[in-house]
Amino acid sequence: MKTGSLIAALLVSTAWVGSPLAAEPADMSRQIQAMEKQIRDMQKQLEDMKTGTQGAMEAVAREKAAREAAEKAAREAALEAGGTLVFDAGKQKVIPPANPKIVQSGTNRFTLSSADNAWTIAPTGRIHFDFGGYLNQNPEGTTGPGTVAGGKLTGGVNVRRARFGVTGRALNDFTYSLILDAGGATDATAAINTASIGYTGLRNTILEMGYFANFFVLEEASSSNDSLFIERSTPSTLASNFNAGDPRAAVGFRTWEPNYWFGAYLTSSTPNTAHALTKRTLGAYSRATYQIIETGLQSVHVGIAASHVFDVPNSGVGTARSFTMSERPELRIDPTVLLNTGPLGTLANPVTSVQIYNAESAAAFGGLFAQAEYFRTVVNRRGKTDATFDTGYGQISYTIGGRRTYTANCGCYSGVNPVTPFNPLKGDVGALEFAARVSVANLTDQFDPTVLAAAQPNFVNGGKQTNYTLGLNWYWNSIMLWKFNYIHTDFDRFNPRTAAIATPIPLGLKVDSLSGRFQVMF
């Protein structure tokens, strides 16, 4: 109670002093003195109480500060020792330090992970060792490929791919890859194959940039480890070589669910593109796919894609902006190209842009698998009509002891993982896949070999190539396999008629090839 309130209460209780019955003045003086003493006593009690409360609060604060200082010192000592100190039910407990761990996948591939799984690093690699030869070379002329003058195709061996690197995750939501390749169409020195960073913080979505394999067409979206034949088809290679091949600088995103995939990317040059060029390739592509059926054991897949090159490269100062479309007969043992348009642009008539359109389909029913794609390529040339090329392929396979399945994050199909790995002591043979493919690539446009070349200013004479391929793939386990291919190539091409030569000169070739590959991947 406050002092003012006490005085008011005492005055009220003594209000009778002013009444006719009031006491004598001496008695009243004594009563007032007694009340003043009571007030002073009560004030002293209040001050004593305030002083005691403040002291108690200060004591509690000192005790808390001392306890927190002791706990901090204990935690720091535990951290210096590599552990963590926690307090459970008033008792101290030291948790041992968390060490990195090794995580093993279902296919026995291992990853080194931090204790909290926020950081991972895993070795990755593939070795594709090819061997083969060419049989029954039947040229249609005397100067084209397969002739003494044009050069016979020769067999041999080739390390098609020898890639080694690391992949992993950083800070939970980022991925990274750094892979070098010492292989190639011919044996080569090591070069960058993949150097990329991705962000995966959004559900079923990756935002990525760097050098990496692109997803423009269905066959390119599948890893080279998972291709049905030793080489991808000529049509898909021609279509993706403009601005979406493997690997290529790109930035973009892809998103997916079990029944659809969509991606869009801005792309540029390959890792080995010369930096001296005054103009480089710059383009973009997008691809969308849909699973009409997807049950795990059965699937039906369709998709479309479009690519546009809007910045066409040249080869240096004062050179034409141009592309050349060329390709070998689906085997990389001999470097001879059959299909070859030559430069599609000149200084007077440069290539201004290129469009590629694609339709894709695939289906899997147990061990049965089929896939097909169609491509249309339009090359825009200043001062000339557009050059248009149609290409496509279809392939089918049947697997015993395994099957191909749909992979949602690439909108493509995986390779075969044998149900029972190869083990001759137990009589296990792994998995066997029997395959067939037909591909057609026609790089001839606005051309009639019976008409004078001068009368055909817009013609392109790259030839027409049809390949018939049979394949056998023998999967030992999840990381080792053999591939064997027989290819019959039918290549047609004529030199145009000239004023001096009235009859077109045939440059075609029919050739058979046998090839194999031993493949290791991890």
Briefly describe each language-model feature range:
Residues 21-126, 138-140, 400, 404-420, ...:
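N-terminal periplasmic/intermembrane-space "pro-region" immediately following the signal or transit peptide
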Residues 105-312, 389-426, 431-449:
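Outer membrane beta-barrel
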